[in-house]
Amino acid sequence: GVSYFSPRFGFTCNMVENFEVVLANGDIVNANATSHRKLWKALRGGSNNFGIVTAITLRVFSQGKFWGGQTFHPISTRKDHFHALENLIAAVPYDKYAHFINTIVITNASYGNWFIGNSLQYTKSDPPTPFPETFKPFTDIPRVALFPGAPDNTLRVDNHTAFTLEYAALNVYPKRWQFATISFGNSAEMMEDFFQMANETIQPFLTLPGFLLSVAYQPLPTLMSERYGEVDSLGPIQTQGNMFYIHWAMSVDGSEVETDRKFEKVTRDLFQRAEAKAREKGLRRDFLQLTSNGTLKELWRVSKEYDPTGMFQKQVPGGFKLSEMDEDSMEL
């Protein structure tokens, strides 16, 4: 996935130099660039399909304290954010120290009202750069406290661990989550179109216990989508120009089991309508996170080689699975 450092170093999975993996037959292998290379490539983005990963060796780099945090804004400012995000994505050259996510959220706790929570990290350090010019279009947008007495931002200079713990604290109790993703060509107008369709879609669910929807608009400039030419299973290197992608996360309390199929249906319908709208505007794009249709056949073959009985397809629940796919009918 995308990290604070992806503009400089690429997707997180591509930082993995070695996977120690327990296979379905009990063998322990090391998958890397020179040994079990096909398995290494598959695990770089192929999810939980091939074995139990018991150790990971990551490429590392030096990183000091940096500036970042969250800012909170009224939903009425969303078009200002969308235009600023479009310009950020289109910047030439793209600022490799800039990590930004624009998230619009609606939840029971906000009484059914949308709000905006931005995540800004500027990873230049030694020394850090507070309020960099790159983020000025966002930091100039009026902010608001989410609740009386609460801060309207958490911006500061801190270390990576502190920023990670800040976001981890947002998920404090078990919930039922649905995740989805779609990408579009860089367009503030398409960002607004998606918001309007999402708002219409979720209205029937606002009173469900623990309901929350987070729609994150994430930049995907070409220097990230080209992935520095790394070997992985995220699909072909993209040549469709600057993009943004949506990370959709909808949840309710853990007891609301009956909502699963409803959520899946309405989300599929929404994404189909959004894709049709994007096609009309010439903004449809192929990129999908986690994996791509262009790599499914290769992943299927790796699964058959390393897990011929399909144990990790049939006995490990959850996540993206290959077990329902027929090699001969797959599109390439």
From Swiss-Prot:
E.C. numbers: 1.-.-.-
Conditions for induction: Expression is up-regulated during the late stage of P.nodorum wheat leaf infection and is controlled by the cluster specific transporter elcR.
GO molecular function: flavin adenine dinucleotide binding; oxidoreductase activity
Disulphide bond pairs: none
Keyword field: FAD, Flavoprotein, Oxidoreductase
Main enzyme class: oxidoreductase
Pathway membership: Secondary metabolite biosynthesis
Entry function: FAD-dependent monooxygenase; part of the gene cluster that mediates the biosynthesis of elsinochrome C, a perelyenequinone phytotoxin structurally similar to cercosporin. The first step of elsinochrome C biosynthesis is performed by the polyketide synthase elcA which catalyzes the formation of nor-toralactone.
Family: Belongs to the oxygen-dependent FAD-linked oxidoreductase family.
Designated name of the protein: FAD-dependent monooxygenase elcE
Organism: Phaeosphaeria nodorum (strain SN15 / ATCC MYA-4574 / FGSC 10173) (Glume blotch fungus)
Source taxonomy: Eukaryota, Fungi, Dikarya, Ascomycota, Pezizomycotina
